A protein has these predicted regions:
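Conserved alpha-helix/loop element of class I SAM-dependent methyltransferases that forms part
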Residues: 45-62, 78, 82
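Conserved beta-strand signature within the Rossmann-like core of class I S-adenosyl-L-methionine
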Residues: 160-168
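A short glycine-rich, Lys/Arg-flanked "PGG" loop and its adjoining helix->strand segment in the class I
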Residues: 146-159
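A short SAM/SAH-binding and catalytic strip from SAM-dependent methyltransferases
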Residues: 132-145
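Class I SAM-dependent methyltransferase SAM/SAH-binding core
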Residues: 74, 78-113
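Conserved class I S-adenosyl-L-methionine
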Residues: 63-71
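Conserved SAM-binding strand-loop segment of SAM-dependent methyltransferases
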Residues: 111-121
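Class I SAM-dependent methyltransferase Rossmann-like catalytic core
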Residues: 21-54
Length: 210
């Protein structure tokens, strides 16, 4: 029975990864460099910063950082710059599900090529631990958030580090109750960020200390 359950869970994750690939790969590759190739519908750098610079808030000390789902690597290039403005040094690393996007990220950021890996967050084995790990709640199927956070805490994050989970929606999506979802999963946030935006759904991020 346990083996059957494990097989079902693996199949569930593999199907979710295939769904993610089918939804994102073509659009992200077509967008190429810049914010568009990292999932932003607005391609200006100002809009990109407004959407993502809040991720610097939980990075309150020097350290290494893994971006799960790094796409074309644009956040790997920009977030350390924003942190440096606050006097904090962040060494970026990336994990990307799609080999084509990981290859694009390595091409666009050759200085980071040896720090950008390809794999699924629920099966990939990290070569080291990181001070900070950022991930999205939709990188696993609904109901699997607890598994995602547990794996990131046990295998990805260094002692004293932080798992930072965000929930983003497009203009037609309904906001997800990220903070409640984390609490229900057994991981009440140690910190929360809720940014309201005119005529748009809020930006939500939360962190869990390791």
């Amino acid at each position: 029975m346990a083996s059957s359950c494990d097989d079902a869970l693996v199949s569930d994750l593999e199907a979710w990864d295939r769904r993610t690939a089918s939804q994102l790969e073509r659009a992200y590759l077509a967008a190429g460099a810049g914010p568009g190739g990292s999932g932003s519908s607005e391609t200006s750098e100002g809009a990109w910063r407004a959407k993502r610079q809040h991720l610097c808030v939980p990075m309150d000390g020097d350290g290494t950082w893994l971006d799960v789902g790094c796409a074309n690597g644009h956040l790997l290039a920009t977030l350390p710059v924003w942190c440096a403005e606050r006097g904090i040094t962040i060494e970026p690393h990336g994990l990307e599900l799609l080999p084509t996007l990981a290859a694009l990220a390595r091409f666009l950021r050759p200085e980071l090529a040896d720090r950008i890996w390809t794999g699924s967050v629920m099966t990939w084995t990290p070569p080291r631990r990181f001070t900070y790990v950022t991930a999205l709640d939709d990188q696993v199927p609904p109901g699997r958030l607890a598994d995602l956070v547990a794996r990131l805490r046990s295998e990805f994050v260094a002692p004293g580090g932080r798992v930072i989970v965000s929930s983003y929606t497009d203009s037609n999506g309904a906001p997800r109750p990220l903070f409640d979802d984390l609490s229900d999963a057994g991981y009440p946030p140690d910190g929360r960020i809720h940014i309201d935006r005119p005529r748009r759904h809020p930006l939500l991020s939360a962190w869990i200390d390791a």
